[in-house]
Amino acid sequence: MPKQKTHRASAKRFKRTGSGGLKRFRAFTSHRFHGKTKKQRRHLRKATMVSSGDFKRIKAMLTRLK
């Protein structure tokens, strides 16, 4: 059976944390900031953790991510 490969697009978007979780960056950050409040823009700069519902699916795509 062939080796399972890492999904390269996902590998660029997620990072593994020291405790084994997955860190991701937020959506809605590429343009159209004039419609967002200063508080929204400030919170969009921060990374967040992958939700528990998505964790199993993303972990399967990132088989060899360190």
Swiss-Prot record:
Keywords, ordered alphabetically: Ribonucleoprotein, Ribosomal protein
GO CC annotation: cytosolic large ribosomal subunit
Pfam families: Ribosomal_L35p (PF01632)
Positions of region (Disordered): 1-21
A GO molecular function held by the record: structural constituent of ribosome
GO biological process terms on file: translation
Keyword Transit peptide recorded: no
Tagged with keyword Secreted: no
Ranges of biased composition (kind: Basic residues): 1-16
Recorded family membership: Belongs to the bacterial ribosomal protein bL35 family.
Name recorded for this polypeptide: Large ribosomal subunit protein bL35
Organism: Streptococcus agalactiae serotype V (strain ATCC BAA-611 / 2603 V/R)
Taxonomy of the source species: Bacteria, Bacillati, Bacillota, Bacilli, Lactobacillales
